[in-house]
């Protein structure tokens, strides 16, 4: 068996490594960026060193994937070339590739991807998988006695960088006719937070990496929106958190001023919140001279758009309704099993209290005689890659792949039929 490279090619991050391993060899941003100190765009570095080595203040960003689909093959080729040569140190001609691709991709994008793999890099064979099917495979292997494993059926909710999918999976194949999508993901959340902060305090519209870091460290899902809005309006310090901006001298990246205080509100009981609600704090205007930003209701209004897309002017259903619509599109025999096998994956599921909020909103929409069980992956960012690594270690993997010779003889469209039935 040839060397197998597993590549989870996300819109935000690339996870890559050798098949059969537990964790990927490297995780890098799927982009090129140009810091203010540089005259040219720089290849991405692994996440463990990215923020420490380079000042990303006002860095320009170029991405090959937009809204989940490949739009710049030349840029993707450049990023992959750096990945294979400098980080993975592999020879594509003697390697097989397991590559993830967003569901419902259009034929022109599929052809471009196949050309990159076989014609530009010369991989010996290729297997394309939907990320959600790999999540299902990994979770079924982790829970051999669960209903998910016994029925080989699940509903994967993938809140990724570009958008959110509710995908029914049966026997490791996605049921494409039942897939539902919300056009919201990590990128949209970051952009919304940039707009809120820029309107209320200082202009951070060019600070993509900075605001993204603040979002990941400070945002959470509200379990009682009206209560939290009242607390924020009253200037209550339990909601407020401060994010310190880099000054370029003592520190080149932002950080949370008091991490423990930022988590304090999450542990409040309902009785305590009623007491503190009556304590009105002094509301102050933003100090434009301070090198920091204060976040109050922004912390929960940003993730709230996942449940209320109408807040952004979008005519789309929220997350709970999206899940119900996806399950209702499946055969009635599958529906009770799908409600018991809901899996949350993707970086945006890391918002605190998201699972609890989803359970509360989903239960009233589900028939009383159906049980609802939601599980969150142990690592929602690496879950897809780990499923791919598991599939790559299967003895049947090579027979599932399309070889370069088959691609050259039959073309992209004919070869694709082997991946998705």
From Swiss-Prot:
SUPFAM superfamilies: Actin-like ATPase domain. It comes from the Eukaryota. Transmembrane segments: none annotated. One of its GO terms (biological process) is seed germination. Keywords: Chromatin regulator, Cytoplasm, Developmental protein, Nucleus, Plant defense. One of its GO terms (cellular component) is cytoplasm. Changing residue 280 to D: In strain: cv. Yo-0. Mostly expressed in flowers, and, to a lower extent, in seedlings, shoot apex, stems, siliques, seeds, and roots (at protein level). Disruption phenotype: Early flowering, leaf serration, production of extra petals and weak apical dominance. Changing residue 311 to V: In strain: cv. Oy-0. Changing residue 290 to E: In strain: cv. Kil-0. Changing residue 231 to P: In strain: cv. Aa-0. Changing residue 248 to S: In strain: cv. Goe-2. InterPro entries: Actin, ATPase_NBD. The keyword Nucleus applies. Belongs to the actin family. ARP6 subfamily. Component of the SWR1 complex which mediates the ATP-dependent exchange of histone H2A for the H2A variant H2A.F/Z leading to transcriptional regulation of selected genes (e.g. FLC) by chromatin remodeling. Binds to the promoter region of FLC chromatin. Required for the activation of FLC and FLC/MAF genes expression to levels that inhibit flowering, through both histone H3 and H4 acetylation and methylation mechanisms. Involved in several developmental processes including organization of plant organs, leaves formation, flowering time repression, and fertility. Component of the SWR1 chromatin-remodeling complex composed of at least ARP6/ESD1/SUF3, PIE1, SWC6, SWC2 and H2AZs (HTA8, HTA9, HTA11). Interacts directly with SWC6/SEF and PIE1. Also interacts with H2A.F/Z proteins. This is Actin-related protein 6. It comes from Arabidopsis thaliana. The gene is ARP6.
């Amino acid at each position: 068996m040839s060397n197998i490279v597993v590549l989870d090619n996300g819109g935000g991050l690339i996870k890559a490594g050798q098949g059969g391993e537990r964790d990927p060899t490297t995780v890098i941003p799927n982009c090129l960026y140009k810091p203010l100190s540089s005259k040219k765009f720089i290849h991405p570095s692994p996440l463990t060193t990215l923020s420490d080595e380079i000042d990303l203040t006002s860095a320009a960003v170029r991405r090959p994937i937009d809204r989940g689909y490949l739009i710049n093959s030349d840029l993707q080729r450049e990023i992959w070339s750096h990945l294979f040569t400098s980080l993975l140190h592999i020879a594509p001609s003697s390697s097989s590739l397991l590559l993830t691709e967003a569901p419902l991709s259009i034929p022109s994008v599929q052809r471009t991807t196949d050309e990159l793999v076989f014609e530009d890099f010369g991989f010996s064979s290729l297997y394309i998988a939907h990320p959600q099917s790999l999540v299902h495979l990994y979770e079924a292997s982790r829970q051999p006695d669960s209903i998910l494993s016994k029925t080989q059926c699940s509903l994967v909710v993938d809140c990724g960088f570009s958008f959110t999918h509710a995908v029914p999976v049966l026997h490791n194949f996605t049921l494409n006719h039942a897939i539902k999508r919300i056009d919201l993901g990590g990128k949209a959340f970051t952009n919304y937070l940039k707009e809120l902060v820029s309107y209320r305090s200082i202009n951070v519209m060019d600070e993509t990496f900075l605001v993204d870091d603040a979002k990941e460290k400070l945002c959470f899902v509200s379990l009682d929106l009206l209560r939290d809005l009242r607390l924020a309006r009253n200037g209550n310090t339990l909601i407020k958190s401060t994010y310190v901006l880099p000054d370029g001298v003592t520190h080149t990246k932002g950080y949370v001023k008091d991490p423990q205080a930022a988590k304090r509100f999450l542990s409040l009981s309902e009785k305590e919140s009623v007491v503190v609600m009556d304590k009105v704090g002094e509301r102050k205007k933003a100090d434009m001279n301070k090198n920091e930003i204060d976040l109050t209701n922004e912390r929960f209004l940003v993730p709230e758009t996942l449940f209320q897309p109408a807040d952004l002017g979008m005519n789309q259903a929220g997350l709970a309704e999206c899940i119900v619509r996806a399950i209702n599109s499946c055969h009635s025999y599958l529906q009770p099993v799908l409600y018991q096998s809901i899996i949350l994956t993707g970086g945006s599921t890391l918002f605190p209290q998201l699972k609890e909020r989803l359970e509360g909103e989903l239960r009233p929409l589900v028939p009383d005689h159906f049980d609802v069980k939601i599980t969150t992956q142990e690592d929602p960012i690496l879950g897809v890659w780990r499923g791919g690594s598991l599939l790559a270690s299967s003895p049947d993997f090579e027979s599932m792949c399309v070889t370069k010779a088959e691609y050259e003889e039959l073309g992209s469209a004919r070869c694709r039929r082997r991946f998705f039935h």
